[in-house]
Amino acid sequence: MPFTPRPKQAEVLNFRAGRMGVVAVPGSGKTRTLSYLAAQLVAESDLQDGQEVLVVTLVNAAAGNFARQVGEFVKERGLLPNIGYRVRTLHGLANDIVRERPALAGLGDGFNILDERDTGELLQDAAYSWARTHAGSYQDYLGEEHLDNARVIGQEWPDLVKDTAANFIRQAKDFQLEPDTLRELLKAYGDSLPLAEMGLDIYEAYERGLRYRGAVDFQDLIRLALRALEADRDYLNRLQYRWPFILEDEAQDSSQLQERIIRLLVGEDGNWVRVGDPNQAIYETFTTASPDFLRNFIKERGVKPRELPNSGRSAPGIIRLANRLIEWTLEHPNPDLRLTRICARAVPSTVR
């Protein structure tokens, strides 16, 4: 079925160069619009040999959807699919960068990446071992109102330790904090921080397990890719030439490290489109990801702000309710709870 852009989608598709930030509501057709834009840039931009339009998204399912749709639009223009563009997840992109020059990240050529199942088992072993050797210490974390539930909490103690440690390790890696650095910071702090010490003990055991296997985990890929890009300017210049256009999906869930990687790849003169919905950020509660990176990008000098406000996914009543909830957060009597950020109102649309 031919793609007929809505007026707001057409505004996005007018992009030719520079930087653009797009706030897109659910059901606004952002994937289709971004896919069409990628194909349009492949067909109409003056790409040289070895250059590609890079589409970056968050998860594998979205990457597959983008690859299919961009391929369809490219074929409609009489071009061969899979030429002139690349679709990657952020972690897939980081893996490409590290695999190409592992020495820059301090790795050997044959390094392994543990999948989520293996890293989950490694973390569980480290956390459960710590919990067994600190079997009664959970009571130190209970307030008086929870003492009656101490027995139940004790039964759940190993899993509570594991979940807490997983969050600790995730955030430590996002902030590029190695166990040795954290240990020195804790010593310098002076006061006892039992929860931080627990997380650090398990972090150290987890990292020992990775080193024993000669492996890294998916969380390592982002920081190692950043290390590689910062270590070799010539390598970074080659990648900037390779990807003169970068289109970023789900930008509301970008972390500081992820944004730094893409900023480096874009450089001073590159072309960058970021699309996302700040109201749909799902990773900020348990990672360092934040929709503020997208909001602040849209406010930057020279960035073209655009919206995709037309939703074809929900009935008008549902959209009115969602908009009212957003208005309520803007007017909340507690100033600390007000949503005072860039957000888009959804507009019902029967056009798909």
Give, region by region, the residue ranges found by the protein language model.
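Alpha-helical scaffold elements adjacent to nucleotide-binding pockets in ATP/GTP-utilizing enzyme cores
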Residues: L37, N65-F73, L93-E100, D118, ...
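ATP-hydrolysis module of ASCE/P-loop NTPase motor domains
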Residues: A103-D201, P305-S311, H332
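P-loop NTPase Walker
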Residues: M1-L107, N237, R320-N323
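Proline-centered turn/helix-capping motifs that create local helix->coil transitions or kinks
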Residues: K173-T181, D269-G270, I326-L339
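Conserved helicase NTPase motor core
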Residues: M1-G29, L54, R86, D115-T119, ...
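Short helix/loop segment immediately N-terminal to the Walker
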Residues: S137-A150, A231, Y235-R242, H332-V347
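Conserved coupling/interface region of RecA-like P-loop/ASCE motor cores
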Residues: N60, Q280-S349
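A short helix-to-beta-strand connector/capping loop
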Residues: G78-Y85, R301-K304, P348-R352
